[in-house]
């Protein structure tokens, strides 16, 4: 199983107070591209999605701020407020695989995380920002793979799966 994660940062030009930006960026950048790639690889190996006949996947991870995610949330979900994570799946998982899926990686979609909101939530939960970012990434990943939480029971199932995924990775190593 192979997963390629394309990571983008969109924080540097924003109107976040400079002291907050400096601290948040320092913490967020503790998770290197190699670490993100390793985490997603572990998560995929655990989840064993069977979408791609060649077991090769791609996804994008955008780490941004509240203003950018609020714009996306307003545009696509008609909720004009920031949120912690959005996931935009490329696939309709009810579709039949095409011949192209036998030749190329399956593009799952995009996960967008507000580092600004993640930092606030990490502080409220009293854990490091990298742990919160990993938690939100697992939530977005599960959405890309077809998970949803329309009921309290489904939300609990999803949260339990997120905890399993977090336990597979050494999140604390990213904070040292």
Swiss-Prot record:
Binds 1 zinc ion. The keyword Nuclease applies. It comes from Acaryochloris marina (strain MBIC 11017). One of its GO terms (biological process) is rRNA processing. This is Endoribonuclease YbeY. Coiled coil: none annotated. InterPro entries: MetalPrtase_cat_dom_sf_prd, YbeY, YbeY_CS. The keyword Cell membrane does not apply. Zn(2+) binds at residues 139, 143, 149. NCBIfam families: rRNA maturation RNase YbeY.
